[in-house]
Amino acid sequence: MIKNRIKEYRAIFDMKQEELARLVGGRRETIGNLEKGRYNPSLALAWRIAQVFKVPIEDVFTVED
């Protein structure tokens, strides 16, 4: 299972789901589903999200057994 800290980083950056979605070329619903663990991102999307927050991808996403 892939866990993420998207919501935490959005709070740090005072960013709404809509804004993050726009910056990564996605939809608000996708960001919401990622945050709730309902959807695993593609590598490209995960990389773009990490770029927005200016952190390594592994700071945002972790894999748990």
Model-based region annotation:
Residues 17, 28, 46:
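Helix-turn-helix DNA-binding elements, focusing on the entry/boundary residues of the two helices
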Residues 44-59:
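DNA major-groove recognition helix of helix-turn-helix/homeodomain DNA-binding modules
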Residues 36, 55, 65:
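Short, conserved catalytic or interaction motifs in soluble domains
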Residues 19, 30, 59:
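Residues in the helix-turn-helix
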Residues 25-39:
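Recognition helix of helix-turn-helix/homeodomain-like DNA-binding domains
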Residues 4-23:
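Short basic helix-loop element that most often maps to the first helix and adjoining turn
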